[in-house]
Amino acid sequence: AASDVYKRQVYDYDVLRQRLREMAFLTKNLRIILTDKRPGQERTETFHYEGGIKEFVQYLNKSKEALYENVIYCEGERDGVYVEVAMQHNDSYNESTFSFVNNITTPEGGTHLAGFRNALTKTFNSYAKANKLVKENEAALSGEDIREGLTAIISVKISEPQFEGQTKQKLGNSEARGAVDSVVSEQLTYFLEQNPTVAKTICEKSLLAQRAREAARKARDLVQRKTVLSGSGLPGKLADCSDNDPAKCEIFLVEGDSAGGTAKQGRD
């Protein structure tokens, strides 16, 4: 009997509350009532969200400052896959993206998440280039730069979901990628065209992230360069160059304790 295996059945109210709230967010207008009748722990909570996953994003962003007021929302159906996506950037540097299939969380992502990220990167780069928000000599925005400070919910409904991985927490349906990519690309493009101020705000944040990442890379390369030189056993009077172009690099061999400083000052 079950009672022989599970000697004591204890329900964790906080775990139940989190999951039921999540389900209410994922199914707009669904009303869920959670009641605890255990002596000394009596309480009741109702979960009902008319805005669905748009309110989910606002809930996740409540402790942060959103960069724009309205949550971006995309909805549609392609090839039998129903797609819902909500997103909003905040002033943080971290990405918080959560994906679901038939209201089941997919912690390892999968094809629906891949489709979303591809659409996001493609659409923002197209918009930035068309509206000259990115200079001709600047590299395209990376997905990582665009997703900095992004909170997003990706929810798809599929009749026969296929899960991959040892823990079955990753969606494998190939049609989900195309469906999400198509719906998000089309509707996000329209949103950006209709909301140029929001579009510019997101692109500017992405460009800052790109420049910060590039500056960090250069600083890291410089440290590694110095580390290699200092660990090579070369004499201290051998000063490394700071230019990455080999044609502009040179080595000065100098005599005396103070000559190194004046020699380096004479470099062009």
What is each residue range found by the language model?
Residues 1-268:
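GHKL-family ATPase ATP-binding module
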